[in-house]
Protein backbone atom coordinates (compact mmCIF):
# COMPACT_ATOMS: atom_id res chain seq x y z
CA UNK A 1 0.00 0.00 0.00
CA UNK A 2 1.48 3.34 -0.98
CA UNK A 3 -0.02 5.95 1.32
CA UNK A 4 2.37 8.43 2.97
CA UNK A 5 2.38 6.83 6.42
CA UNK A 6 2.97 3.33 5.05
CA UNK A 7 5.81 4.74 2.95
CA UNK A 8 7.26 6.34 6.09
CA UNK A 9 7.25 2.96 7.86
CA UNK A 10 9.02 1.34 4.89
CA UNK A 11 11.59 4.14 5.03
CA UNK A 12 12.12 3.65 8.78
CA UNK A 13 12.70 -0.07 8.28
CA UNK A 14 15.17 0.66 5.46
CA UNK A 15 16.99 3.10 7.73
CA UNK A 16 17.12 0.46 10.49
CA UNK A 17 18.70 -2.02 8.07
CA UNK A 18 21.17 0.68 6.95
CA UNK A 19 22.13 1.48 10.58
CA UNK A 20 20.81 5.04 10.13
CA UNK A 21 19.01 6.27 13.23
CA UNK A 22 18.56 9.93 12.34
CA UNK A 23 14.79 9.44 12.45
CA UNK A 24 13.62 11.70 15.30
CA UNK A 25 11.21 13.50 12.95
CA UNK A 26 9.09 10.33 12.83
CA UNK A 27 8.70 9.63 16.58
CA UNK A 28 7.38 11.53 19.57
CA UNK A 29 10.02 12.19 22.25
CA UNK A 30 8.02 10.09 24.71
CA UNK A 31 7.17 7.23 22.32
CA UNK A 32 6.05 4.09 24.13
CA UNK A 33 7.52 0.89 22.74
CA UNK A 34 6.16 -2.51 23.66
CA UNK A 35 8.27 -5.50 22.61
CA UNK A 36 6.15 -8.52 23.45
CA UNK A 37 5.76 -8.04 27.25
CA UNK A 38 8.51 -5.43 27.74
CA UNK A 39 7.71 -1.70 27.74
CA UNK A 40 10.32 0.94 26.90
CA UNK A 41 9.67 4.66 27.28
CA UNK A 42 11.21 7.39 25.16
CA UNK A 43 12.76 7.92 21.77
CA UNK A 44 16.37 7.74 22.99
CA UNK A 45 15.83 4.37 24.67
CA UNK A 46 14.20 2.96 21.53
CA UNK A 47 17.06 4.13 19.32
CA UNK A 48 19.67 2.72 21.73
CA UNK A 49 17.99 -0.67 21.43
CA UNK A 50 17.94 -0.54 17.63
CA UNK A 51 21.56 0.69 17.58
CA UNK A 52 22.64 -2.22 19.82
CA UNK A 53 21.40 -4.62 17.16
CA UNK A 54 24.13 -3.28 14.84
CA UNK A 55 26.84 -2.37 17.37
CA UNK A 56 26.66 -5.36 19.72
CA UNK A 57 24.45 -8.20 18.55
CA UNK A 58 24.28 -8.72 14.77
CA UNK A 59 26.00 -8.38 11.42
CA UNK A 60 24.40 -8.57 7.98
CA UNK A 61 20.94 -7.43 9.09
CA UNK A 62 18.34 -7.55 6.33
CA UNK A 63 14.55 -7.33 6.19
CA UNK A 64 12.66 -9.33 3.55
CA UNK A 65 9.03 -9.94 2.62
CA UNK A 66 8.00 -6.51 3.95
CA UNK A 67 4.31 -5.64 3.77
CA UNK A 68 2.94 -2.43 5.30
CA UNK A 69 -0.54 -0.94 5.37
CA UNK A 70 -2.16 1.86 7.33
CA UNK A 71 -5.62 1.81 8.90
CA UNK A 72 -7.63 4.99 9.41
CA UNK A 73 -10.30 4.26 12.02
CA UNK A 74 -13.56 6.17 12.43
CA UNK A 75 -12.48 7.03 16.00
CA UNK A 76 -9.66 9.08 14.47
CA UNK A 77 -6.91 6.66 15.44
CA UNK A 78 -4.35 5.83 12.77
CA UNK A 79 -2.26 2.65 12.92
CA UNK A 80 0.28 1.32 10.45
CA UNK A 81 0.99 -2.41 10.50
CA UNK A 82 4.13 -4.10 9.17
CA UNK A 83 4.90 -7.78 8.62
CA UNK A 84 8.36 -8.94 7.58
CA UNK A 85 11.15 -11.47 7.89
CA UNK A 86 14.23 -10.21 9.75
CA UNK A 87 17.59 -11.90 9.19
CA UNK A 88 20.96 -11.37 10.83
CA UNK A 89 24.17 -13.11 11.87
CA UNK A 90 25.14 -13.13 15.54
CA UNK A 91 28.31 -11.14 16.18
CA UNK A 92 29.30 -13.39 19.08
CA UNK A 93 27.92 -16.81 18.11
CA UNK A 94 28.18 -16.53 14.32
CA UNK A 95 24.74 -18.14 14.17
CA UNK A 96 22.43 -17.10 11.33
CA UNK A 97 18.98 -16.10 12.51
CA UNK A 98 15.66 -15.73 10.70
CA UNK A 99 12.72 -14.24 12.52
CA UNK A 100 9.20 -13.28 11.43
CA UNK A 101 8.02 -10.02 12.92
CA UNK A 102 4.89 -7.91 13.18
CA UNK A 103 5.06 -4.25 14.24
CA UNK A 104 2.16 -1.86 14.90
CA UNK A 105 2.70 1.90 14.84
CA UNK A 106 0.18 4.36 16.29
CA UNK A 107 0.34 7.80 14.73
CA UNK A 108 -0.53 10.98 16.66
CA UNK A 109 -0.12 14.41 15.06
CA UNK A 110 2.01 12.93 12.28
CA UNK A 111 4.45 11.10 14.56
CA UNK A 112 4.70 7.60 15.98
CA UNK A 113 3.50 7.67 19.60
CA UNK A 114 3.29 3.90 20.19
CA UNK A 115 5.31 1.08 18.64
CA UNK A 116 4.22 -2.46 19.41
CA UNK A 117 6.57 -5.23 18.25
CA UNK A 118 5.82 -8.93 18.21
CA UNK A 119 8.55 -11.45 17.43
CA UNK A 120 10.45 -14.37 18.93
CA UNK A 121 13.12 -13.15 21.33
CA UNK A 122 15.21 -16.32 20.89
CA UNK A 123 17.93 -14.69 18.76
CA UNK A 124 18.16 -11.56 20.91
CA UNK A 125 18.32 -13.51 24.16
CA UNK A 126 20.91 -15.96 22.80
CA UNK A 127 23.17 -13.25 21.36
CA UNK A 128 22.87 -11.02 24.43
CA UNK A 129 23.79 -13.94 26.71
CA UNK A 130 26.74 -14.91 24.48
CA UNK A 131 27.95 -11.30 24.33
CA UNK A 132 27.66 -10.89 28.11
CA UNK A 133 29.55 -14.15 28.72
CA UNK A 134 32.30 -13.04 26.30
CA UNK A 135 32.83 -9.83 28.31
CA UNK A 136 33.67 -11.69 31.54
Ranges and model annotations:
Residues 1-18, 135-136:
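Short, low-complexity N-terminal intrinsically disordered segments enriched in polar/charged residues
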Residues 20-72:
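A solvent-exposed, acidic/Ser-Thr-rich amphipathic alpha-helical stretch
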Residues 25-26, 76-77, 105-113:
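Short, solvent-exposed coil/turn segments at beta-strand boundaries
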Residues 73-87:
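Conserved N-terminal glycine/acidic-rich loop preference
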Residues 83-111:
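Exposed beta-sheet edge and beta->alpha loop/turn motif
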Residues 114-136:
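Low-complexity, intrinsically disordered terminal/linker segments enriched in charged
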Amino acid sequence: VDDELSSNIKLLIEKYVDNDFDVSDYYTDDVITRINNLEISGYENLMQGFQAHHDVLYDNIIVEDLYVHTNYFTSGEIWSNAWFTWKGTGKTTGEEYTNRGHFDYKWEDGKIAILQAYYSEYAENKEAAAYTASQN
